[in-house]
Amino acid sequence: MIKAGIIGGAGYTAGELIRLLLNHPETEIVFINSSSNAGNRITDVHEGLYGETDLRFTDQLPLDAIDVLFFCTAHGDTKKFMESHNVPEDLKIIDLSMDYRIKSDDHDFIYGLPELNRRATCTAKHVANPGCFATCIQLGLLPLAKNLMLTGDVSVNAITGSTGAGVKPGATSHFSWRNNNISIYKAFDHQHVPEIKQSLKQLQNSFDSEIDFIPYRGDFPRGIFATLVVKTKVALEEIVRMYEEYYAKDSFVHIVDKNIDLKQVVNTNKCLIHLEKHGDKLLIISCIDNLLKGASGQAVHNMNLMFNLEETVGLRLKPSAF
């Protein structure tokens, strides 16, 4: 059994990660660290886990007792932890924050998008889990980059559910504001753009165009629905072939020949992609569950690869809407 520890156990991504690991046939949770909830039952915070666990939060860190450590912490906290603690040399780490997503000589974290860096992830000791928007958008663009087709700016509009804002309440997460409402935020300046560009340039070194990304807040709890537009004269049939070929060995990305919707992916680790041509414009529709394929599900996917397990173990999930 893979023995796992979690630091930062009170948020939405942590709750989903706990649920996945509790039901993972090859994993045992040793501890869930949360200084603000130490001593409390996990179900005091994650009430959807009633009947599934008797675990309690702890402020202890028995790092020598685990094989893999997940960070579900606020941005900046993982880096502080790594700099201030003696982490066992052979301990595998999966960081769900954005601290190590950008390549640097200062760290050895692999960018953990399996559809891009599968081979590197399989041998990695430290993995940086991608952002939710970044995952959805990259999966819509990677086959084009692989075929050197990103020669102009990319237009992206993507809407996310309220869980994307985290568990702490804010002015834009209250039900009375969010319900029956929509708004944009961080237009052209979202923090996930640099990691998207980094990945595209990894496949297409000549890529130097803009990602014109406008994020939207949706009035639903979870999921990301993105539309991407690029210009190309290549026929749709050839583009579909490129996408199917690129994702042929990936278990969670599926090219769908009819229009898609968010309910098809919520509560799964899938990404569905639909392609259309309108004149010289290619429309790419990509959708994921922000908490699973965009966070905790992808983290478990990375764990499976790091421990040489079949990649779908513990992740064969049914959409919650059907």
From Swiss-Prot:
Coiled coil: none annotated. Its main location: cytoplasm. Keywords: Amino-acid biosynthesis, Arginine biosynthesis, Cytoplasm, NADP, Oxidoreductase. Its EC number is 1.2.1.38. The active site is at 132. One of its GO terms (biological process) is L-arginine biosynthetic process. Pathway: Amino-acid biosynthesis; L-arginine biosynthesis; N(2)-acetyl-L-ornithine from L-glutamate: step 3/4. It holds the Pfam family Semialdhyde_dh. It catalyses: N-acetyl-L-glutamate 5-semialdehyde + phosphate + NADP(+) = N-acetyl-L-glutamyl 5-phosphate + NADPH + H(+). Catalyzes the NADPH-dependent reduction of N-acetyl-5-glutamyl phosphate to yield N-acetyl-L-glutamate 5-semialdehyde. Belongs to the NAGSA dehydrogenase family. Type 1 subfamily. This is N-acetyl-gamma-glutamyl-phosphate reductase. The lineage of its organism: Bacteria, Pseudomonadati, Bacteroidota, Bacteroidia, Bacteroidales.
